[in-house]
Amino acid sequence: MINNSLKITDLPNNERPRERLLRYGSEVLSNSELLAIILRTGTLHENIINLSSRILKESGGLNGVLNLSFEELKKVKGIGNAKAVQILALGELFKRFKAYKSFESVKITSPKEAANLVMEQLRSFNKEHLYVIMLNTKNIVIKISDVSVGSLNSSIVHPREVYVEPILKHAASIILCHNHPSGDPKPSNEDLNITKRLYECSKFIGIELLDHIIIGDGIYISLKEEGLL
């Protein structure tokens, strides 16, 4: 079956978004042109530039279209399953990038907020990673560091590796976060032993250990909330 959808390559060279991006840089392209590069093809009666422009207009702009559900996207004329999935993937990447880039100046007031801050990164790893969230006196995030990779045990996780950067950053407190690749956040005996050891060290160092959060597959356990810290 012949694909009659109008493609970017069907447009004149000076109107093709990809060529314009390569020649002038991505910053000069409009939102509709950038979306056209992602979606690639138009419909039988509408080229991709016009389609992208209409999608943005009918959805209330870039923020609007990136927050639509699959069902809502499918209601927009010209969007089928493939284009809806492409837009959903683009929106999710944008959300993850925004969360990753904007963690600084975030104030942590609950274990849930701390877990949400690192959930997407930690749940994607197939090995255990130990993150240290460093906070100032107002519980605002200074930095997040990945200090250990591999199964958590006392021979690998040394207090020196955990506390050296918080000391250099003048952190007032820290929150430990690590993942269980199995998806089950239930703490192991080793998790509890390491937490106890690091908590005792925090008393001498003067940097308070507020919590140890274990990340599973979209779920978490706070040792503080469980009364284990």
Swiss-Prot record:
Name the UniProt key words of this record, in alphabetical order: Hydrolase, Metal-binding, Metalloprotease, Protease, Zinc
GO molecular function terms noted in the UniProt entry = metal ion binding; metallopeptidase activity
* One of the GO BP terms on file: proteolysis
Q: What Gene3D superfamilies does the annotation carry?
A: Cytidine Deaminase, domain 2
Which segment of this protein is annotated as the motif JAMM motif?
178-191
Is this entry keyworded Metal-binding? yes
Query: At which positions is Zn(2+) bound?
Result: 178, 180, 191
Concerning its family, UniProt says: Belongs to the UPF0758 family.
Q: What is this protein called?
A: UPF0758 protein CA_C1241
- Tell me the organism: Clostridium acetobutylicum (strain ATCC 824 / DSM 792 / JCM 1419 / IAM 19013 / LMG 5710 / NBRC 13948 / NRRL B-527 / VKM B-1787 / 2291 / W)
Lineage of the organism: Bacteria, Bacillati, Bacillota, Clostridia, Eubacteriales
